[in-house]
């Protein structure tokens, strides 16, 4: 699924694309951390789009989506550090330890480097440190998975918004397909914010 070397997306030269015109008429830009991992061209495109979007006053959401098959933890962290000053809504970046100075992290998939199933207090502390370091953030959200078996999981979400950390109830369900779960969470959050839903 990550065999994207030498794909049209990875190899394309975006330097001739008028990003300002491309974003005309839009209020919101959502980007994924998978795109910049594909090639230097793609990482430059993402940073350029972030800058142009903020210049045009768009709301920007960013989902870190770290994939160890695409780039290293250090590469991902360095890139996301450049992105965060332009981001309003943040998803999927906690594994990078971007709220900390030290470089402690696990090998391989760094999702193992932070609590996979944090308490409310742990999550609130992480959110607060993020906001102190990146005061431009308006919302931070993550979902937490509890795997009971290969076919049954539970999910809940945490969100920091307007100075408060919120925790959802726990939902247990039978899995039909694991593909796109994080994207579904992101799209649901974006829809809710566009329609002024209350945090809970």
Model-found features: residue ranges?
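Conserved post-catalytic alpha-helical subdomain immediately downstream of the catalytic base
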Residues: 169-200
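A short helix->loop->beta-strand "cap" motif at the edges of active sites that frequently abuts
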Residues: 52-59, 134-138
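Hydrophobic faces of well-ordered beta-strands that scaffold small-molecule active sites
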Residues: 60-62, 90
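Catalytic-core regions built around general acid/base machinery
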Residues: 44-57, 79-86
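Short, small-residue-enriched loops and turns at beta-alpha junctions
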Residues: 8-10, 37-38, 67-71, 147-150
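Active-site beta-loop-alpha junctions enriched in small/polar residues
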Residues: 5, 34, 65-69, 95, ...
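Conserved phosphate/ATP/ADP-binding segment of small-molecule kinases
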Residues: 70-163
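Conserved N-terminal subdomain of the carbohydrate kinase-like
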Residues: 1-36, 60
């Amino acid at each position: 699924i990550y065999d994207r070397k030498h794909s049209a997306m990875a190899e394309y030269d975006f330097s001739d694309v008028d990003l300002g015109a491309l974003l005309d008429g839009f209020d919101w830009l959502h980007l994924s951390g998978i795109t910049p991992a594909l090639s230097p061209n793609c990482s430059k495109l993402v940073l350029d789009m972030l800058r142009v979007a903020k210049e045009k006053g768009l709301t920007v959401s960013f989902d870190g989506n770290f994939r160890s098959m695409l780039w290293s933890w250090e590469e991902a962290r360095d890139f996301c550090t450049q992105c965060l000053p332009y981001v309003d809504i943040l998803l999927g970046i906690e594994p990078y330890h971007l709220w900390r100075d030290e470089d402690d992290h696990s090998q391989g998939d760094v999702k193992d480097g932070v609590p996979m199933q944090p308490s409310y207090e742990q999550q609130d502390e992480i959110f607060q440190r993020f906001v102190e370091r990146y005061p431009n953030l308006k919302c931070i959200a993550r979902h937490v998975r509890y795997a009971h078996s290969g076919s049954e999981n539970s999910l809940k979400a945490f969100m920091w918004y307007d100075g408060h950390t919120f925790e959802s109830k726990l939902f247990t369900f039978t899995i039909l397909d694991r593909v796109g779960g994080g994207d579904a969470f992101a799209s649901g959050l974006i829809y809710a914010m566009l329609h002024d839903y209350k945090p809970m």
